[in-house]
Regions:
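Residues within the DNA-recognition helix of helix-turn-helix
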Residues: 19, 40, 153-156, 160
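Structural recognition of an alpha-helix C-terminal capping motif at a helix-to-coil junction
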Residues: 25, 39-46, 61-73
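Internal acidic/polar
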Residues: 84-108
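A short pre-motif secondary-structure segment
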Residues: 125-129
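Arg/Lys-rich amphipathic alpha helix in sigma70-family domain 2
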Residues: 54-58, 68-89
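C-terminal edge and immediately downstream basic/flexible tail or linker adjoining helix-turn-helix-like DNA-binding
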Residues: 141-146, 159-174
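Short, charged helix-capping/linker segments at alpha-helix termini
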Residues: 5-13, 24-43, 147, 169-174
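Sigma70-family region 2
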Residues: 5-6, 29-32, 45-60, 81
Length: 174
């Protein structure tokens, strides 16, 4: 950790090699285009390298979480800067569906693809709430929306995702 903090090039390279795939996976949760995610990762690692001195290392898990937060925040910033967010009213409501489908037989990559097909703001709220475990209050502040809007977007995202899952499972039956 000291070599990284002192800016030793080989140590920074090892840090990048160790966490770049993890960072890419997080970026792809928010932004489905790999080229755009690469831009976000470049910005993220610049931020990681320049602020590593202020990071309080408490083991491997704390470093990984810190890197994940930086990538998530930078991805949301990127989406906001490029105006990828839609208003909630721009997306029609999905009809009510009976119950949540069972996702046990769906491969993680397939589920990630489905999440990637959600509208940008739906995908962002869903990822922050489910994977990052942020409260709606914090999501609302980050995205510049009301807390109730974050809750509504999450509910709609969950419904849209459930519909995609049901359609996928139905297609697998035949």
């Amino acid at each position: 950790m000291e070599a990284i903090r002192s800016g030793e090039r080989a140590a920074l390279h090892r840090l990048y090699d160790r966490y770049s795939d993890y960072a890419m996976a997080i970026g792809l949760r928010y932004i489905p285009e790999r080229d755009e995610v690469r831009d976000v990762l470049q910005d993220s690692f610049v931020r990681i390298f320049t602020s590593i001195g202020q990071f309080n290392y408490n083991g491997e898990g704390s470093l990984k979480s810190w890197i994940g937060r930086i990538v998530s925040n930078r991805a949301v910033d990127y989406l906001r800067e490029h105006q990828h967010f839609m208003t909630v009213d721009d997306i029609p409501d999905e009809p009510d569906e009976p119950e949540e489908p069972d996702i046990g037989d769906i491969l993680p990559d397939t589920l990630t693809e489905m999440i990637g097909r959600l509208p940008t703001n739906y995908r962002t709220v869903f990822n922050l709430y489910v994977f990052e475990q942020w409260p709606h209050r914090k999501i609302a502040q980050l995205m510049g929306i009301k807390e109730s809007t974050s809750s509504s977007i999450f509910f709609r995202a969950r419904r849209m995702l459930a519909k995609q899952i049901r359609e996928y499972l139905k297609s697998q039956e035949t």
